[in-house]
């Protein structure tokens, strides 16, 4: 071996150059470095220009929820094992190659089980809704090819274990040969770890299958269906296929016996390993001693590290360690070492449960009871595994809160250090080692937190023990910490990737430095023993492998080489432990992405989603912790990688995942968004109505909820959707404010202020509703008004100038209005013929009202008082300057009041004024109908360019000899346009028509009592003015006790009714002769002067007499308004 090395060192002498160096290589290197630097600068500028072109700033911080890509830094081996294991020692090459190949196959089988078999078996039975008859059988039918693959996979595991045992039996035996001599003092612990991994896989499969009760139940139903079809093939149209059905049934029974009954691992360890005449296993004492030695050593290392703070991924191997021990007992039937079993039992009590795959848990006590029942007698007859688990659960519950708090502080410190780019000084070597330590610390933290989370959930589920609400919050806090760690690794992935090569180099240097201690012991020697020669070859191979990338294949071979090196006994136990530690670190650094993802996985939350509403309720009561919601949602979607592998349903991604996502979104909406929207709305209302002196809440008793914390959250990423709480609350408030504002239009200002407050307090930009202030396109229908015109005129007031009717009073806080647009829309609905019908109804109404009008004036008491006033005015006309005296008006009002007052406090004069107002409202409605008709006609004909030159479409169609139907349609069009044109240009003089129809009768000699009407007009006008002043005063004071009649600010129906009646009676000249408005003007001026003179005489200041003067001015102003309305109304009835 040594000679071969010297030969290798001198075999390339012909390629050796002389030592002369002219500096040209340095110049070339600097030139290339300059070009590379310029390329990097140019590339950065191009990227910056692309970013500016996209008009979008790229996020400087990586986010695991939104980043479309991530850095994948796992190395892959390009060389075969044969090329890696290449030395001049042929026996060494052969043995190392065989066992490294076995270890590599074990690793591949383990990865295959984790990626292909675990998830489909775990999620089988998860349904997307209500299942119907036959769905279970269909699901099993889809699973059948998968189960056949699983059977082949299990058989491959069996054969691999047989191969390992056969290899062991060949090298560990009493008969001496070159192999036994080589492995005399070598303990291949790396191979035993591979066996542990295989046993873990088989035990995990047993646990997953047996704990999924839906799988066994569905398989039984499918088997019964096959038997039924086989017994009645004609019924199911499968006659002639009996052989296939028999084969299918046999296959189902075979798969059930092999896979579904929990004997996968047991069948493995009970298979035959002896090959008579070739390999002896059970009688091989050397193999038994070697096996026993390795089992004890491995268990010793496992027992000391399990539950330790530096533990990492040991619990996942616990089933494999137990499987290795059970395999040893089954293989060699050795149950004599009771002390060792007690050590195993102590570990079992310390770790009574292990999470092996998401929601599947493994219990070592059950494993021992099933496969080693005779060993339980060693620990006594009082064995009660359920009580052990309850005690363990009590301890976990007791320590849970404190451990979560401790982990929270540790994670916070670790995240700060990982995010920090500063170092504590020292060399680059020290900094890199520090980064390695930080990475491993993060993985260890996530591992322990994940174990705590799964242990709490698993024990409570298995023992059906209730969880405290506070513990539920702590459970989700564990998930938040796991996602925080994973997110930190993701954010720092660029830094980690940049340092991985240096980290690997440093770790390999440390390993080589340790191995140099062994190498130095053999330096300078010319003769070596066989064992020493094997150690030197192993050292050389280790050095060669560590010079390359740290792939799984290289690390496997290095571990086998280290097992060979350890036999030299040169390294101390501490050095060996450090070597193992650095090899483990090297493995972690090389595959950090997969390890972090596995240790931070929160898929178990899918099977604990019933706890999610409790967590959301706690979060809503503590808004300061709202930022943790995104981490929890990230944890909840970890199960996607599991559900996506479901085989029993078609398109699992669109069915299982969508059902789960919708369920979670519904919980968030129910427990966060809906109550948040209502509480924000309530808070805004309390702020806006603070002037009402609402009783304030005591913050020390009720607490203060900072709802803004939820609204400050960035949009939450959940699966492929985004939950924007701020946007949803804005939409809720927009919708609520709009709907409520629509019902109560008078509250528009309140809701406008609430929108402003929502912006200033919560940053919510709400939409303006753009509701009309008080006018809608649709009001009371003209047909309904026509049928109930007697009610309409009494409940609505008319405004002459705006040509609008306003409701007197309403049960709500809004008043309905009717304008030209409403009437126009009604006419468009019913047709223009409704206008004439409306006039007919108005005529009948006027006939009834004029009958009452005539009766009032025919009354002897009224008639005598009017005659008296007319006589007095005629006799004293000159003394009164032709102006009707106001004293007579006051006297007439007093006399009529003496005739009686109604229950509502109205006199006969008030009733008479109301009668005239109703008549005027009817006339105003007729005017409104006419205006609405013209509005309708103008809108209908507005697309005709010239009404004076309208072509005849009938002539045009006839000229071109179009079809009769077209000619008929053009005739109809001509008729419609002609009618609309006439209606628009001519219109109908309804007022003139109604004057003519009543004038003759009113001026008849039989109605002589009506000729004195004009003399009561001043009294009616004064009564109207008093009524308007009183109503406006009460409206201004916002009195809540006023009656419906007083709630008005306009009532021009009285003016138009008065003008109409004066025209009917032809008494306009008679009324003008009274010069009543001049009298009122003179009276007001005289009263003001008199009051000022009296005030001056008495020395009263002007401001003390202000109210009296103001009253006179209001009276004068109201009379002027009435005068203008009355004068405008008289214009309608001029000839």
From Swiss-Prot:
GO terms for cellular component: endosome; phagolysosome membrane; WASH complex. The modification N-acetylalanine is found at residue 2. It comes from Dictyostelium discoideum (Social amoeba). Disulfide bonds: none annotated. Belongs to the SWIP family. The keyword Cytoplasm does not apply. Probable component of the WASH complex. InterPro entries: WASH-4_N, WASH-7_C, WASH-7_central, WASH7. Keywords: Acetylation. The keyword Acetylation applies. This is WASH complex subunit 4. GO terms for biological process: actin filament polymerization; endosomal transport; endosome organization; exocytosis; phagosome reneutralization; protein localization to lysosome.
